Design a protein with these regions (language model features):
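DNA-recognition helix of helix-turn-helix
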Residues: 73, 77, 142-166
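Structural recognition of an alpha-helix C-terminal capping motif at a helix-to-coil junction
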Residues: 45-52, 56, 62-74, 151
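A short, charge-rich alpha-helical start-of-domain segment used by transcription regulators
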Residues: 2-31, 41-44, 59
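Arg/Lys-rich amphipathic alpha helix in sigma70-family domain 2
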Residues: 56, 63, 73-91, 103
Length: 166
C-alpha cells in the first residue's frame, strides 16, 4: 500500500471545503449555467442550487467540480422539460461576450449560434471548448458514452459552421 502524507493508506488531502470550492469555481459554474440556459440570473440560480445540493449531501463528494457541472446540466434539462422554457433572444448572451478580453462581434455571433444548439449539444460544446473537458469528462457530466459525446460535438460543430458562415 502506498504511503501518503497522512500515513499509510490515508488520503493525502482533505475534502475541499464549501468556501474553497465556491471561491475557486462559482464564477466558472455561473458562466457554464448561463450559456446553457441563456439567462444570467437563471444561471446564477442554477449554480446556487448545484452548490446547495453538493454540499448538503449526507455523504460528501470527493471531487465537487464534476458533480457541480452535472447538477447544473441536469437542472437545466429539468427546467426545459418542466417549464417548457422558450429560447431567449441572443441579446441575453451579449453580456457574456463583453466579459471576454477579445469580445467583439465575432464572439457574439458564435455565442448566439451556441445558444441555439439543442441542450445536449450546447452542453458538450461548452464543456469541451469553454471548460476544456475531455470527452470522458463530458460523457460523465451528460450521462452518456464518449462515442455519444463525439457525435454530439460533430453535429454541433457542423451546425455552428453553417450558422457562423451566414
Amino acid at each position: 500500500m502506498a504511503e501518503f502524507a497522512g500515513g499509510v493508506g490515508m488520503r493525502s488531502a482533505a475534502r475541499p471545503t464549501f468556501e474553497s470550492v465556491y471561491a475557486e469555481r462559482h464564477t466558472q459554474l455561473v458562466r457554464y449555467a448561463t450559456v446553457l440556459v441563456g439567462d444570467r440570473s437563471l444561471g446564477e440560480d442554477l449554480a446556487q442550487e448545484a452548490f446547495l445540493r453538493c454540499f448538503s449531501r449526507r455523504r460528501p463528494v470527493d471531487d465537487p467540480w464534476p458533480y457541480l457541472r452535472t447538477t447544473v446540466t441536469n437542472l437545466a434539462k429539468d427546467g426545459f422539460r418542466r417549464n417548457g422554457v422558450a429560447r431567449r433572444a441572443a441579446s441575453l448572451l451579449r453580456p457574456l461576450a463583453t466579459d471576454s478580453v477579445d469580445g467583439g462581434e465575432n464572439r457574439t455571433v458564435i455565442l448566439d449560434a451556441v445558444y441555439h444548439l439543442p441542450l445536449r449539444q450546447r452542453a458538450a460544446v461548452v464543456l469541451r471548448f469553454y471548460e476544456d473537458c475531455s470527452e470522458r469528462e463530458i460523457a460523465q457530466v451528460l450521462g452518456c458514452r464518449p462515442g455519444t459525446v463525439k457525435s454530439l460535438l460533430s453535429r454541433a460543430l457542423t451546425t455552428l459552421r453553417l450558422e457562423v458562415q451566414r
